[in-house]
Structures are given as structure tokens and as C-alpha cells.
């Protein structure tokens, strides 16, 4: 009830993703997410929204759309017929808020730092590169201020790295930044990342021809 911050949120847990990594199908992950969603709603009296591959309707697939209004606005949003929760009560939990549960592809959290303290520029670049603004498919982005460093950041979530590569987000951000006379001063990956996403990016910048994951030593060892 007293939390503040730059990143959108609608609950204490906020989101629970089910990600098929190995020896499991997306269909199995979807079924499990729905089973857990029903149990969470019942056991904890918590409104549950199914999202991404588990979504019960197209307008619920995008987590940003589900989160819109955030914790403070969810009490009114949840009253709308199109935003009734899939499981649980029809009003937010007093302290836990609401939660989104669903199956999805591995998400790559990728941030690009800009040599400007102007947050409006970071916001504008984010709007240009994200899919909802006419940019890259499977790309979500927002501008963030890094006060301690005196710079800003384009914070990106790549929701399907197999369809839209990391280097495309990096290069499009570079192009848009030039329009403001701004440069990229670094980037970072938050959390875990699939090896394939990094190999794909390295292959692009090195100009490798006919390269495949089968040539990666660690990948071959793991297969054994």
C-alpha cells in the first residue's frame, strides 16, 4: 500500500511465469499455469489474471495491458466486464493486490544505457522501438532514469528472442538515439538469458557465415 517506484506493478507477487525449458511442451506449461492459477485464487483469495500463452482472451495476452492501472487503479479496473479475473475474487486483495499467471517463452530483460540525463529522450526512444508504438515485434520498452549515474536507460523486455533478436533492439535504439544527438554508453542483461540469444547476437556482429549452435562446445557437451 505504500510502495512507489518506476516499474509498473499490480501486486506483491505481481507475475508468475511458467517457462518451458527442457523436456516439457508449451501446452503442458499452459495447463500447469491454469491449475496453479485456480489454486492461488482459491487458497489465497487473490484475483488471478491469465496472461501470454495462457490468456483467456487476446486483450489479456500482453502483461503491460493487464498491469495497466497498477495496484492503485485495479479496484476500478477489475469491475469492468472485460477485466474480470480468471480466478479468485472480483476485488483486489487488501495487501497483496492481484497477480498475473501464465506460460510464456523465455523473456530476455535487456537494458540499454544512454549518455543523457533527459528522461523524455529515453521515453521517446522506448516508444519508437516497442511493438505497441509501431516498433519491433516481441519488444516492450520504457524509459528509466538512473539518478545515481546521471544517465537514462531504455529498459527492454524481449518476449520472443527467436523472432526478434537482441541486436535488432540494440541497433534500432542506436538509430533513434542519434536523432537526439545521444549515444549508447553500455547495455546489460538482467537475470538469466538463453545461450542461443547471445550466440545469435555474436554471430551477427562477427559476420559469421553458416554458423550453428552445433558448433558451440558447451552446447555439444550438454547434449551428451
Predicted regions and their residues:
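Long, contiguous binding/interaction regions
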Residues: 1-224
Amino acid at each position: 500500500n505504500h510502495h512507489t517506484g518506476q516499474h509498473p506493478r499490480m501486486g506483491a507477487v505481481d507475475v508468475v511465469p511458467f517457462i518451458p525449458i527442457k523436456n516439457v511442451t508449451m501446452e503442458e506449461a499452459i495447463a500447469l499455469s491454469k491449475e496453479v492459477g485456480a489454486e492461488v485464487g482459491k487458497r489465497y483469495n487473490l484475483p488471478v489474471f491469465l496472461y501470454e500463452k495462457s490468456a483467456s482472451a487476446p486483450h489479456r495476452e500482453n502483461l503491460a495491458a493487464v498491469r495497466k492501472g497498477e495496484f492503485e487503479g485495479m479496484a476500478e479496473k477489475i469491475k469492468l466486464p472485460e477485466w474480470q479475473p480468471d480466478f479468485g475474487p472480483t476485488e483486489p486483495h487488501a495487501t497483496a493486490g492481484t497477480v498475473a499467471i501464465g506460460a510464456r517463452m523465455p523473456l530476455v530483460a535487456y537494458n540499454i544505457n544512454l549518455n543523457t540525463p533527459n528522461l523524455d529522450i529515453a521515453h521517446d526512444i522506448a516508444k519508437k522501438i516497442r511493438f505497441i508504438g509501431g516498433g519491433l515485434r516481441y519488444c516492450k520498452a520504457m524509459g528509466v532514469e538512473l539518478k545515481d549515474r546521471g544517465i537514462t536507460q531504455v529498459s527492454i523486455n524481449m518476449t520472443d528472442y527467436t523472432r526478434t533478436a537482441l541486436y535488432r533492439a540494440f541497433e534500432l535504439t542506436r538509430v533513434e538515439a542519434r536523432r537526439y544527438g545521444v549515444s549508447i554508453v553500455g547495455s546489460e542483461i538482467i537475470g538469466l538469458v538463453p545461450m542461443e540469444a547471445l550466440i545469435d547476437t555474436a554471430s551477427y556482429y562477427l559476420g559469421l557465415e553458416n554458423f550453428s549452435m552445433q558448433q558451440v562446445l558447451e552446447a555439444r557437451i550438454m547434449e551428451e
